[in-house]
């Protein structure tokens, strides 16, 4: 999961920055959206690389509260305000007061929740590392991929944005080429897995595939997470269509690439397609 991995790397980059400024030993981290696919992926990808002894509160909306997260590094972890049972932590319901005493808040909750709680996080003195699209194009919010523009972490005003997954894997490949010779144009086609649509999308792929193989017709299949049947199909429609008939996913790749690379003159043409694969986005990139 490129978004979870990148959020983790931004987290570590921020930890290094806070430590270099004399932050206390043992930073407190809060993970908002712990019970969802993005938050859970972020939890797994961090492994034991988080500074030992740091608190790791798991926070979620009302639906996810009470969910078990699992032991961290194979050990029980005593976390402030959380119940640590045999084999795991219990997720708490998130509220504005959840971020008191937290240094870094990892958000994987969706844009609406991130916008709603931004003020509470920053007022508590924490740094929000946000996995949603809420702040990516805000001028005062750095959009960071550590392998590409790690220095941008330094100018945050309390929020650091994590790019779209399809943008992340592309700019990581573009950066060393750009360092050799400035890039003029990029044509990219993406083949994006169901995981990009979250747990409901993956469940729908599984269910539809099973139903299709059992002989059900298109009319009998349940279609809710995608615009069309995803089983044995490719859908060139990720997010909503815009006025120029491109999709918002394609627009994200264009504008995010320019911001991350620090070059508004790069021309980017993107075609984004959802494919019937559980995990693993693929891209074909032509670079001039």
Question: Which residue stretches match the model-derived regions?
Answer:
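N-terminal Rossmann-like NAD(P) cofactor-binding subdomain of oxidoreductases
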Residues: 16-230, 266-267
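Short hydrophobic/aromatic beta-strand micro-patches
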Residues: 286-288
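Conserved glycine-rich beta-strand-loop-beta hairpin in the small C-terminal domain of fold type I
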Residues: 279-283
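Oxyanion-binding "anion nests"
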Residues: 227-278
């Amino acid at each position: 999961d490129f978004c979870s991995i990148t959020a983790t790397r931004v987290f570590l980059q921020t930890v290094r920055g806070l430590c270099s400024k004399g932050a206390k030993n043992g930073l407190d981290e809060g993970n908002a959206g712990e019970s969802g696919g993005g938050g859970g992926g972020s939890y797994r990808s961090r492994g034991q690389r988080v500074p030992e002894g740091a608190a790791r509160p798991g926070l979620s909306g009302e639906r996810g509260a009470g969910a078990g997260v699992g032991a961290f590094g194979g050990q029980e972890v005593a976390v402030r305000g959380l119940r640590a049972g045999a084999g795991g932590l219990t997720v708490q319901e998130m509220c504005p007061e959840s971020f008191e005493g937290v240094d870094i808040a990892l958000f994987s909750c969706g844009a609406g929740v991130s916008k709603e709680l931004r003020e509470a996080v920053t007022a508590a003195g924490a740094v929000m590392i946000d996995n949603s699209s809420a702040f990516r194009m805000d001028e005062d919010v750095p959009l960071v991929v550590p392998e590409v523009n790690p220095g941008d972490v330094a100018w945050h005003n309390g929020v650091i944005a994590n790019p779209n997954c399809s943008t992340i894997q592309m700019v990581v490949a573009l950066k060393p080429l750009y360092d050799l010779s400035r890039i003029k144009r990029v044509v990219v086609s993406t083949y994006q897995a169901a995981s990009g649509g979250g747990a409901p999308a993956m469940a729908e792929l599984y269910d539809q595939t099973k139903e299709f193989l059992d002989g059900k017709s298109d009319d009998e299949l349940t279609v809710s997470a995608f615009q069309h049947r995803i089983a044995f199909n490719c859908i060139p429609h990720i997010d909503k269509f815009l006025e120029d008939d491109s999709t918002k996913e394609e627009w994200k790749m264009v504008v995010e690439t320019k911001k991350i690379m620090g070059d508004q003159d790069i021309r980017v043409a993107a075609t984004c397609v959802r494919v019937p694969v559980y995990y693993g986005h693929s891209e074909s990139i032509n670079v001039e």
